[in-house]
């Protein structure tokens, strides 16, 4: 009998040792300390991320410089011929402020500002100068302020661009200006409205405002890069405008695609950011934060963005390898995390996803005492050199975060292999 009892004790000891090697945790009653196999790795103060908030990329570029001149014949208002030039004015020292009726554009005057879903032009100055054709002396000057704004639609192939032109300066023989603005576009694009306002004759302080409309409907599964183009005519009433105008193109391209359901347009040059704030996405966001902040590859940071993989079969295979039976170390659900599930980072739907789950850092994010605490299994302490992270995340937070990633792909028109960053701030 004593010998049998000793054998049972040895078998029990072996079973406990095996459980420790596989990382199995003992369930903890609510409100008690974590199981003994779990150790605190680090903490994350929600206020630290909430203070800064997410940052979206943007860019700016100057209105392209240029000068266009033409010889004018005599007219009713001028007995002799003249030479007229229209050019972009770069100096801003003597500018008269004008309201930006075409929309507020937070960039220095004379520049375009772009983000993923819009672009605008801020108070660009263009001058019309009248020269004596014989001695080249200046006979008169007119100036306009041109501002514009456009909002792209991620679920439509057309958009309006609103313009406002205001006469800000008239000198000498230039007492008014005729202003005409038209638009066109290149590469699988058409104009629903090419002429902003026809021809408007304006005196000092007067404005003209209206819009042009671009349209693009690429074939299903294709992508097109559109270049909006513009032509501005400034001349004096009574003169023949002729075939000359001041021409320029938008300094970036508008990308329209039909890769997924429907059409949509964005500024593809602006890299987009996926926002999954810790305050909203809880343990899922804490897992992504840890993967980006604590692991050597810091996936999804600006200097190491993720790349979308639209192959759904590959995403399923990636998830199988990281979180399911394909992992060399199984994922064991923990009783002290309600509806525990495996959430992986990098995401399965990226080219960086699909790492062996056995090679991932495995963490248990828990919100305790107003702070996120990141635990690990005693026999699998993360080193920071793992290529991925598996988080123990309540199932609803996991699936809801996955749904948000799907909405992000649609709302931002993220194409296959396109880069994006991830932020858990806010």
Regions found by a protein language model. Give the residues of each.
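Secretory targeting and sorting signals
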Residues: 1-30
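Nuclease and nuclease-like effector domains acting on nucleic acids or nucleotide cofactors
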Residues: 30-339, 348-426
